[in-house]
């Protein structure tokens, strides 16, 4: 049992359940959007005694669990002490179910973020929570935000510059903390490579290649694109 658990246990009446909120995901890396989900969830559910952030192990585009934890630790400077960061080797969704199973007397509030107007997010939520009815002590709490920052966008921004990354980070961060986050993220994110094709094209003509290849740019007579 953690120190937070001991303190909460002493404050709760004997017959009152503890409410533990869980926010689980990959967070590769954590963004402004993830941070706002936590803040908003705490505001919308003042009965939360403890909020656990489960950080998944799976690496994404060079960003590791350790890097994600380091970034969250910076964000935690602006979150209450009831927030606890937990790296997990178990897939995040399974970790939520495991916690509920192992703590049947605890009321578990499963925090899930969704971007306003993003139908894909709501479909994803339905897929991820299809087994939730098997756990009587889990209640879903979908937190809808207007921020569209994603881990993918942050990874791509970090490949370009700190200036591109900054708008995807919490406004609360000091300048030196923005630098710290950028340094953490860029460590394993390689910059986009310029790939040449043998196609000979007209000078300064911008083209788009059908299929998955990004918009192309010309250098001299050789087609190049960022991949």
Task: Report residues per predicted region.
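Nucleotidyltransferase catalytic core that binds NTPs
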Residues: 2-227
